[in-house]
Design a protein with these regions (language model features):
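Boundary-proximal intrinsically disordered activation/regulatory segments immediately upstream
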Residues: 1-55
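Short acidic-hydrophobic, aromatic-tinged amphipathic segments that line or gate anion-handling sites
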Residues: 3-5, 68-71, 165-171
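Alpha-helix capping/helix-boundary segments
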Residues: 36-38, 57-58, 74-75, 145-146, ...
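RNA substrate-binding interface of SAM-dependent RNA methyltransferases
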Residues: 43, 101-193
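Short loop/helix-cap segments at secondary-structure boundaries that form the rim of catalytic
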Residues: 58-65
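Glycine/small-residue-rich loop that forms an oxyanion/phosphate-binding "nest" at active or ligand-binding sites
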Residues: 67-90
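A contiguous loop/helix-start segment that scaffolds small-molecule binding in enzyme catalytic cores
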Residues: 201-210
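Conserved small/polar residues in nucleotide/adenosyl-binding loops
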Residues: 213-215
């Protein structure tokens, strides 16, 4: 098995760049770290380009892509966790066009979560994971929201990001228009209301807006 021993290695340089949103957007790729997340990426049919493992890590089996060993100190520089599990993958983004996304969220007849300029990676990952568990059919993000393909969000989402289509728009107005085109009833969270969430019927075909802006 090939072992990467230099930070000038082409694969290693790509992985280093993918820690930045600029290059994730440019290359249409992102990193997924950890045993469970990488395995879920494979099981859900994600397009994995390469799997990297720390030199002291057992060699994983069953991946249809190259598996490359990385000198431990170099791997630790890529890892985004204090106690790395010693495995990460480079994955090609799934970026549906508008019509494909609409078909995906219509087909499931489920709810859609809309993230409006949220920033905290842990919170966003938890929201995506919870929405997936609740049967939501997709995620829409508005410009200004943290990158869903950042390492912390990918890890916090715990595989849910692989199961839910994602689509990004430039404005809240465009997002609402998209939800309405999909036949969703739009509901926004906020403080300026007397309506409590448990009094609202949200079992299906809802576009739920979670916003950083107090509505």
């Amino acid at each position: 098995m090939k072992t990467i021993t230099s930070k000038e290695n082409q694969i290693y340089r790509l992985c280093s760049k993918l820690t930045s949103r600029k290059y994730r957007d440019l290359y249409g790729k992102y990193l997924a770290e950890g045993e469970k997340v990488v395995r879920e990426a494979q099981e859900t049919g994600q397009n994995i380009q390469v799997v990297l493992v720390a030199q002291n890590h057992p060699i994983p089996q069953g991946y249809p892509c190259p598996v490359v060993s990385v000198e431990t100190k170099l791997f630790e520089k890529l890892a985004q966790t204090m106690t790395s599990q010693g495995i990460l993958a480079v994955i090609n983004k799934v970026q549906p066009d508008e019509q494909t996304f609409l078909q995906q969220i219509k087909k499931k007849s489920g709810n859609v979560i809309l993230l409006d300029r949220l920033q905290d990676p842990g919170n966003i990952g938890t929201i995506i994971r919870t929405a997936d568990a609740a049967g939501y059919s997709g995620v829409i993000t508005i410009k200004g929201t943290a990158d869903l393909y950042g390492p912390k969000i990918v890890r916090a989402a715990a595989g849910s990001l692989f199961r839910m289509p994602v689509f990004s728009v430039d404005s809240p107005e465009r997002a609402v228009s998209l939800l309405e085109a999909a036949g969703k009833t739009v509901i926004a969270t906020g403080f300026q209301t007397d309506l409590y969430y448990y009094n609202v019927k949200m079992d299906r075909d809802i576009g739920l807006i979670l916003s950083l802006i107090h509505i």
